């Protein structure tokens, strides 16, 4: 079972009913991130896609259900990390979620990919700077 299949299965019945059959393997490799972090990254990324782009694992949701499903997947991912006592990852993904919202609200959706790359890197054995560090100089309002 792929991480995206697991994400669909972990959703409530209303959202899971919109899951695509046989979703792709996903973006995040369990061999690189570990099973829990890979599941969480996939869940949170799918939540992001439901809010801002085309989801990979779900189809046929109306606009309201897309937003609710996206929020539910954010919560699912963060809750799974909290159950695993992975507070570093909870903090990183909380930053990522809010910074992606900031990037889209400020008209810079292209920055979201940088944020995702930074978060995926810091949550892998390679480590590195996280999402907040990657945009630290750009958080001030532009005039």
Question: PLM ranges: what are they?
Answer:
Residues 1-143:
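All-alpha prenyltransferase/terpene-synthase fold signal
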């Amino acid at each position: 079972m792929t991480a995206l299949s697991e994400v669909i299965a972990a959703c409530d019945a209303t959202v899971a009913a919109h899951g695509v059959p046989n979703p792709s393997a996903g973006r995040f490799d369990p061999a690189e991130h570990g099973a829990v972090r890979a599941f969480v990254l996939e869940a949170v990324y799918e939540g992001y896609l439901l809010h801002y782009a085309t989801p990979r694992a779900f189809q046929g949701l109306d606009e309201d259900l897309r937003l609710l499903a996206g929020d539910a997947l954010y919560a699912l991912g963060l809750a799974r990390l909290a159950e695993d006592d992975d507070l570093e990852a909870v903090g990183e993904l909380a930053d990522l979620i809010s910074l992606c919202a900031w990037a889209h609200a400020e008209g810079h959706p292209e920055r979201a990919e940088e944020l995702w790359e930074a978060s995926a890197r810091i949550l892998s054995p390679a480590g590195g700077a996280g999402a907040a560090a990657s945009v630290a100089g750009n958080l001030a309002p532009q005039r």
